[in-house]
Amino acid sequence: MDAAAGIAALSLAEAARAGEAAVGGKAMGLARLVALGLPVPAAVVLPVGWRGGDSDLAAAVEGIRPPFAVRSSAVGEDSSGRSAAGQFETVSGVRTTADLGPAVTRCLASAGSARAESYVGETAPMAVVIQHQVAAGRSGVAFSLDPVTGRGDEVLVEAVFGHGEGIVGGGVDPDRYRVTDAGAVRVRRAVKPIALEPSGRRRKLPAERQAARTLRDDEAVAVARLVREAEAGFGGPVDVEFCFEAARLWLLQCRPVTAMGAP
């Protein structure tokens, strides 16, 4: 409990009950994934108005293994009317509880950044998600509704080696997999000269790996099936950020599909 403000850090299950106005869009999306029984890395939410110190942060993340990803969760982001993907702050690779305070401060401050205000038109109330950062060897984004064609009979899966910010930020051309509900897969491979590390550092890939497939067919199908489960639970088209930690598939974010445009 944050003694100064009387606002407790919340588990994702508690965040679902608290509601989006208290925990923001990103946290609410994760909470809904957990409620559906889908695989999400362990996380805790600092609700809007949380004002704790280092000891409060250490207590909040007890039981969550470092490293941590500290992620802003603004009220109104990732709603069906708009997505603020990439507009607010995420601090990756936080290795100790002593480093959590500055990371949380950066996320809270991003609510008033010029970039975010120009996107959403106002300073948004901000919560923060502190999540175990898995060692992602491959990452991506998947769409239950194709953002180019508008077709809903295939799941579009985009994937790169390394950390997924390369796709979200537009810095890496991903492999693209179109997966039918019957499990058929069509692949368009891309040359991927770099992989993004959690620190943000770009690592050059060996020449023989640059054109290699990021996902096997069965892995693309596994992603597509979880996306369909999320779509059913959310009640409409979604895009989902995911990663593979070795062979284990994790979902990192889920939001409604908000716009049509080239992937």
What are these regions (language model features)?
Residues 1-129, 136-138, 210-235, 251, ...:
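N-terminal beta-alpha lobe that positions the nucleotide/phosphoryl donor
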Residues 27, 87-114, 139-199, 253-263:
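Extended active-site and interfacial segments that coordinate phosphate-rich ligands
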Residues 159-239, 244-246:
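Conserved catalytic alpha/beta cores of large enzymes that bind or transform nucleotide phosphates
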Residues 84, 148, 245:
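Short, ordered coil/turn segments that flank beta-strands lining enzyme active or ligand-binding pockets
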Residues 71, 131, 158-160:
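Short beta-strand segments
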